[in-house]
Amino acid sequence: MFRGGTPVSLDNKGRLAVPARYRETLISLCAGHLIVTADPSKCLLIYPQPVWEPIEQKLNSLSSFNPQTRSLQRLLVGNACDVEMDGVGRILVPPSLRAFAGLNKEVVLVGQGAKFELWDSEKWNLQMESALAFRDGIPQELEGFSL
């Protein structure tokens, strides 16, 4: 559904203009209602509301007695904010989430199938350098995978 990285700018109010190629899909899928939340990689995740709801339900159904699970619930659900595309296709990225991800004016919106990641441009470039160097190795489940 959503793929590719698109350099975009945040305006002085922290608004992001959603690239035109995604707007129609977002309007038909969720009437422009999106959820923005924090990601452990220090970027933001942006979900169409109907895609987010089962994720949130699953997270909330997990035991809060497991410290790792509770931390993830706090991070993802505790930071989740409802946002809505305005008439010209912009969303307001909440200040607390902009600070969390270290977002400045220049950002990259990265399609990840059913969701987006939003990265500060410099951090995104570092992520790509790391990925190209295979610093973390290739996951076992990808061994034998052919492109």
Curated annotation (Swiss-Prot):
Domain SpoVT-AbrB span(s) in chain numbering: 5-51, 80-123
Compartment(s): Cytoplasm, Nucleoid
One Pfam family in the UniProt entry: MraZ
Single GO molecular function: transcription cis-regulatory region binding
A biological-process GO annotation: negative regulation of DNA-templated transcription initiation
Record has Repeat as a keyword: yes
GO cellular component, one term: cytoplasm
Entries under PANTHER family matching the protein: TRANSCRIPTIONAL REGULATOR MRAZ
Oligomeric and partner information: Forms oligomers.
Protein name: Transcriptional regulator MraZ
Gene giving rise to this polypeptide: mraZ
